[in-house]
């Protein structure tokens, strides 16, 4: 027996036409694929809001010449060592670095780590991307 379930939904014509344009622009091959992603994203939002277990990445660029910035970044990462799985450091040019921090833990704790890093002077950009950990 298949693990796939089929069901029907009723939508206003304007809504389904807008949805079809959207998913075509995103490159989806079918409404089913797009709907699965929407459902997964909504469930992830719920998990995140409830403080559930998530995994993800913090991606940031920063100026490593800023006084004490590198030391503060390392200190903060050690403060949150239980959330950090690994880090990757890339030298973009003479002044700028890219750091990718793989994380796993409760969403609010990961968001605290992300916020602590984002507000440091010299951090040019930071993006947090979360996904389900199960």
From Swiss-Prot:
The family assignment reads: Belongs to the transcriptional regulatory CopG/NikR family.
Q: Give the source's domain of life in one word.
A: Bacteria
Q: What is this protein called?
A: Putative nickel-responsive regulator
* Listed CDD domains: RHH_NikR_HicB-like
Query: Which cofactor does this sequence's record say it needs?
Result: Ni(2+)
User: Does the keyword Metal-binding feature in the UniProt annotation?
Assistant: yes
What HAMAP family does the record point to? Answer: NikR
Where on this chain does Ni(2+) bind? 78, 89, 91, 97
Role of this protein:
Transcriptional regulator.
Matching entries from Pfam families are given as:
NikR_C (PF08753), RHH_1 (PF01402)
Write out the GO biological process terms.
response to nickel cation
Co-factor note (free text): Binds 1 nickel ion per subunit.
Q: Which keywords does this Swiss-Prot/TrEMBL entry list?
A: DNA-binding, Metal-binding, Nickel, Transcription, Transcription regulation
**GO MF, one annotated term:** DNA binding
């Amino acid at each position: 027996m298949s693990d796939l379930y089929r069901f029907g939904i009723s939508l206003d014509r304007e809504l389904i036409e807008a949805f079809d344009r959207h998913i075509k622009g995103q490159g989806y091959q079918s409404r089913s694929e797009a709907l699965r992603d929407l459902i997964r994203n909504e469930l992830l939002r719920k998990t995140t809001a409830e403080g559930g277990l998530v995994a993800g990445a913090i991606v940031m660029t920063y100026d490593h010449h800023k006084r004490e910035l590198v030391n503060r970044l390392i200190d903060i990462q050690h403060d949150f060592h239980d959330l950090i799985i690994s880090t990757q450091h890339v030298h973009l040019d003479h002044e700028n670095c890219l750091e990718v921090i793989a994380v796993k833990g409760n969403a609010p704790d990961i968001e605290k780590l992300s916020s602590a890093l984002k507000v440091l002077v010299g951090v040019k950009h930071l993006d947090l991307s979360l996904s389900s950990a199960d």
